[in-house]
Amino acid sequence: RYPDIEIDIVASNRMVDVTDAGFDAGIRYGGTVPEDMVARRLSADIRWVIAASPDYLERYGTPEHPDDLLHHRCISNRLGDDRIYRWELERDGETYQITVPGSVTVNQAETGLVAVLGGAGLMYFPEPLVAPYVKDGRLRLVLTEWSPLEEGFHIYYSSRRQLPTGLRLLIEFIQEARPLGL
């Protein structure tokens, strides 16, 4: 569609100063960005879910309450600041944060997805990432009544300069294409 526009994509879960790093923009979950940046929503809100393979659930059982996760093999998420993410669950206004026991720790959800598909344990995911695997039966969701809805993807860029034409076109394209159906 735009043959003269070049895109350089770098994937990282770290909070990057896109201006200092020489990038025009960054994309992340939620709208929290450094104060000198502008955030624009790219997607609808995203539900976060816990998924496991049918083999794992047959072998170790299905958790019925968040406390049950303490007795399961869980795949932990390492955040960009190297902290281990505490799973945030919510039901009827009640919030529950839990540090799960991690047999495996990953810093990218896609890496954890490979482990979960292989039966290594349970993991907390953005629902659109696992939806195709749930649909075809390779994964099952657990504790679905505790699945919170959080802010979706946002693109962020410097508020100190005019929006480059290429970046404006990219934003429009992403909003039109709706990646992951969002």
What annotation goes with each model-predicted range?
Residues E127-D136, R140, W146-L182:
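C-terminal effector-binding regulatory domain of bacterial HTH transcription factors
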Residues I7-A11, S76, Q97-Q108:
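Short beta-strand-to-loop elements that line the ligand-binding cleft
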Residues D36-R47, A52-N77, D92:
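Flexible hinge/capping segments at coil-to-helix
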Residues R14, T111-L113, V130:
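Short, hydrophobic alpha-helical packing/hinge segments within bilobed ligand-binding/sensory domains
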Residues A25-R28, G121-F125, L141-V142:
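Paired acidic/hydrophobic, glycine-rich loop segments that form the ligand-binding mouth/hinge
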Residues D68, Y85-T99, Y133:
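Ligand-binding cleft/hinge of the Venus flytrap
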Residues L69, A115-G119, V134:
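Hydrophobic residues within well-ordered alpha-helices
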Residues R1-V38:
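Central regulatory/effector-binding core of bacterial HTH transcription factors
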